């Protein structure tokens, strides 16, 4: 199948001798991608590892994972099984399983120095995503479907088969005489994607829908390029984890572009895991235009007027609770922590406002002098232990020697200007 090589060449960004990982469930799509991508990597003197996540949701899942491993071992492909051993929620199981799957895959890739995780989303998956979002009232960004590349923390998710029909993958496996597994949830009418799949779609209809999704993708690329120019002129970010925004610009640009800008800022500052609902962002934009003197909230952020601008800061009530310092963690999906040379057990990381509220109980009689707005103090990260506050780095306060403390760096999981939407 030449389509994979063409797609990966268009995506680019691989090493001369690429090391890639592929998420493989044992279904026809992921098996076909694994075999094809392994050949692609080998032709370039690179290497591929296949990763199967056993969610432990069905009694037969462990046996299925072993079967996949045997198939791939027979082809000389390295394979690892990653187990989701956490307690399972009573509701939202599909969403929880998806989150766990990507977390386990990302952790393996990062720990093994692999920068590229490939998944087997194909043309019909893209069409289903488009139809689901259309029914939900999505705008252009949502109707563009899935990007061919998505940034994750420490790696990128690559979907090289988005233009390839599922039938082509079945035909490839048949030619290879490669068996595959079937996931019963793909036919369960309780799930919206399964209901869409039950509606037969001829090739002409599928090709037309896929072309339409690509058109939306190109529109999204153009909008993102314009948005990046606006963000560069209207928004400044601070390493303490907040943004300052020029409100005058909101009234001068297209309302939809303004809403996309506000959503991008909120995702960056608040660290939300999923895109924001369009109607909520629209209400925020309208509110900021009508009553700019009022503070507002969205997606774990507060939009607060301050000296002719508005600041976007973390909403304390939506923040992660204080937690023990762990090297390499990304606390509250916002602050990266590096360990000190000497372990310091008992240290807790949180925001100042999550600890005692008086200056003396925090560890200083008077708040340190700082150019930062006072309204920001409650959502500044701090280290706490015995006998109280140990450090508030962004205020320049350190009870212990700074070099002996963990380092806290703002590292938003959602960049303000992430890699652009990719259409191949």
What is the predicted function of each stretch?
Residues 1-133, 163, 167-168, 174, ...:
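ATP-dependent adenylation/nucleotidyltransferase module used to activate substrates
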Residues 90-93, 192-194, 358-361:
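Short, solvent-exposed polar/charged micro-motifs at secondary-structure junctions
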Residues 15, 46, 112, 141, ...:
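Structured loop/turn residues at beta-strand edges in well-structured enzyme cores
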Residues 57-58, 94-95, 158-159, 186, ...:
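A generic secondary-structure micro-motif detector
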Residues 115-116, 122-280:
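Flexible helical/loop "lid" subdomain adjacent to adenine-nucleotide binding pockets
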Residues 57-62, 187-190, 293, 315:
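Acidic, metal-coordinating catalytic cores used for nucleic-acid/nucleotide bond scission
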Residues 78, 160, 167, 207, ...:
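Proline-centered helix-kink/hinge sites
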Residues 4-6, 11-29, 47-49, 84-86, ...:
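AMP-forming adenylation/ATP pyrophosphatase catalytic core
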């Amino acid at each position: 199948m030449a389509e994979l090589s063409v797609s990966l060449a268009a995506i680019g960004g691989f090493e001369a001798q690429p090391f890639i990982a592929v998420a493989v469930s044992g279904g026809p799509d992921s098996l076909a991608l694994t075999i094809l991508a392994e050949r692609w990597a080998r032709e370039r003197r690179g290497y591929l590892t296949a990763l199967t996540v056993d969610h432990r949701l069905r009694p037969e899942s462990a046996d299925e994972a072993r079967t996949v491993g045997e198939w791939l071992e027979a082809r000389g492909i390295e394979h690892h099984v990653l187990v989701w051993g956490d307690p399972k929620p009573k509701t939202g199981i599909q969403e929880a399983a998806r989150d766990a799957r990507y977390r386990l895959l990302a952790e393996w890739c990062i720990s093994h120095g692999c920068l590229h995780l490939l998944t087997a989303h194909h043309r019909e998956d893209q069409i289903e995503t488009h139809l689901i979002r259309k029914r939900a009232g999505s705008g252009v960004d949502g109707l563009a479907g899935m990007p061919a590349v998505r940034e994750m923390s420490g790696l990128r998710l690559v979907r090289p088969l988005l233009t390839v029909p599922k039938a082509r993958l079945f035909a490839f496996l048949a030619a290879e005489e490669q068996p595959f597994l079937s996931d019963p949830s793909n036919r369960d009418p309780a799930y919206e994607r399964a209901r869409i799949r039950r509606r037969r779609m001829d090739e002409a209809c599928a090709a037309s829908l896929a072309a339409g999704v690509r058109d939306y993708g190109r529109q999204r690329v153009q909008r993102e390029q314009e948005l990046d120019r606006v963000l560069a002129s209207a928004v400044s970010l601070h390493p303490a984890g907040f943004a300052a925004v020029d409100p005058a610009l909101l009234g001068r640009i297209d309302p939809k572009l303004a809403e996309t800008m506000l959503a991008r800022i909120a995702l960056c500052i608040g660290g939300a895991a999923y895109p924001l609902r369009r109607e909520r962002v629209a209400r925020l934009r309208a509110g900021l235009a009508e009553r700019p003197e009022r503070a507002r909230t969205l997606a774990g952020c507060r939009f607060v007027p301050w000296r002719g601008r508005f600041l976007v800061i973390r909403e304390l009530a939506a923040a992660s609770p204080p937690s023990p310092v762990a090297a390499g963690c990304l606390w509250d999906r916002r602050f990266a922590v590096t360990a000190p040379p000497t372990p310091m057990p008992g240290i807790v990381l949180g925001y100042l406002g999550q600890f005692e509220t008086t200056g003396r109980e925090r560890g200083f009689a008077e708040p340190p002098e700082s150019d930062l707005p006072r309204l920001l103090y409650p959502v500044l990260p701090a280290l706490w232990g015995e006998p109280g506050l140990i450090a508030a780095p962004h205020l320049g306060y350190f009870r212990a020697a700074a070099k002996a403390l963990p380092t806290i760096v703002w590292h938003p999981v959602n960049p303000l200007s992430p890699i652009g939407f990719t259409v191949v």
